[in-house]
Amino acid sequence: MVTRWLQGFAFAVAVAIASPALAQPIAPHSFTVKNGHFELDDKPFQIISGELHYPRIPRAYWRERFRMARAMGLNAVTTYVFWNMHEPRPGAYDFSGNNDVAEFIREAQQEGLYVVLRPGPYVCAEWEFGGYPAWLLKDHSLVLRSNDPKFIEPAARWFKRLGQELAPLQVGNGGPIILVQVENEYGSFGNDHAYMEKTRGMLVEAGFTKSQLYTADGAEQVPAGALPDLPVGINFGGTDAGAARREFEELKKIRPNGPFFNSEYWDGWFDHWGGPHASTNAVNEADNLDWMLKQGYSVSLYMFHGGTSFGWMNGANSNGKNYEPDVTSYDYDSPLDESGRPTAKYSLFREVIAKDTGATPPAVPAVAPTMKIPEFKAEQAVALWKVLPAAVHSQQLQSMEDLGQAYGYILYRTRLNAASKGHLVLDGLHDYARVYLDGKLVGTLDRRIDQKQLSLDVPAAGAQLDILVENTGRINFNIILRQERKGIVGQVTLDGKAISGWDIYPLPMDQPEEYSFARSSCEGACFYRATFHVETLADTFLDTSAFSKGQVWLNGQPLGRVWNIGPQKTLYVPGPWLHKGENEVIVFDLQGGTGRTLVGRDKPILGGKAE
């Protein structure tokens, strides 16, 4: 009986992979759980999915990535929905351009793929603040990931608006969305089942009733994070031999009857600033994938394609005490690299999927070549001090969120009322500071390595103290995210005495291209402008090794962060973001100087030598 079921199951999977028409329904279909497995239109269905995130991929490349997914043998793709991208200010929604998640899902369907949707509202994902909009932190009494009405009200409003975009695309309405995840790994955070029920209720009220709801946790966290009447996915990695068997054995102690779904199969890992570039054991990962597929279990690769956390969107990790900001690249050592090119891992997984499903996948699409750009100089500059906005005066320090700011930098300025010599202490530095006295740099402090104080010699009353603070990325994991405000969130003391009376300058750096640049030397924190010409539009990798720490924009598009501690030394430049003819690069660098150069490489440098 079991053998006959598996034979029929394998046939259904093979047909689903081989026939795009099955993933392009023109009429309503059903997707449910029956007899311990997923069923599509009352037939067993094995999900073989891969995760990729629409804001981490240039819109012009979405369809190419989907075709690569089909060619590897996948029958579905998985994506989070990133609340902070869609509601940057309360009630102001953005589903345009790269935020058009509905179009992303429609294109997936057109390319023969089902969709597993993960709307959060919390998503983790090594993404800024786990996908939460920073404005939630303005109310210091609001409790994230809880039944606090101050949190539930904006979350429910957000889900209702998202439902207008995506509920029509559920499989029961003729769309490709087969699964919708309730929250995300909540069992690693808490065990408030009333909150999980409320989150499920918000999704139902938003119209997510024509697909199958589920929860996802680590196997041991399922009791804390799951809902008893919903199927569960479990999240784990395959670097260790036999990992999949062990994880599902653990799950079966709690949920012996299935369905069995590895909702995040970690096939790589992410990088922190100051650490190594991650790489994982592809052979063991392929073996664990092979074992799961042979059992008839469903799986979603995390990640199939990582892409890039463009601009300010990298997250950070913490164990509750430390701080580990993520780099801009989300290459993840995944089957498709950061720029969408298949790796050795892609070929290995493709072979496993074809063998286990008995289906011949489509041919792997040809990949356009990358290009080099000759070295060019950043010859124009303007000092940050010359483009400061109007100040907000406050007796006490205020955070970015207190001032309605989400990302970027913030400057705290004051006049010291007496000569003194002692320790300057920044209590609650989030995250990186450069300290100036009368315009001269006296030191840097880095939350990443738990730096909080430096020696300060104030020669006379009236000296100007400037503290320039960078938001290096909000923590996206751990309960500490509830207090993850940026700037200085405590007090500044000198020789044990609190300093008050501040001029505060919010520096979101939304449009640095509007500054007035000139050919001149620049000291301290500076914006640099450079231009280069191309006649061919192709991907390249901008080598920023000549700069120290800051941010880069290309033709007005935010590319990401620069930090000379590595491991990342290049920033991915998508070909569609280039112009034929002149292109503009702006670099904000905390360390001024002259002779700064840039170069476009045909391969990335994500850790050590070019990949």
Each model region followed by its residue ranges:
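The substrate-binding groove and active-site-proximal loops of carbohydrate-active enzymes
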Residues: 47-58, 83-100, 137-156, 181-192, ...
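An active-site-proximal structural segment forming one wall of the substrate-binding cleft
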Residues: 100-117, 140-177
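Aromatic-lined ligand-binding clefts that engage carbohydrates, nucleic acids, or primary amines
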Residues: 422-436, 465, 532-555, 562-563, ...
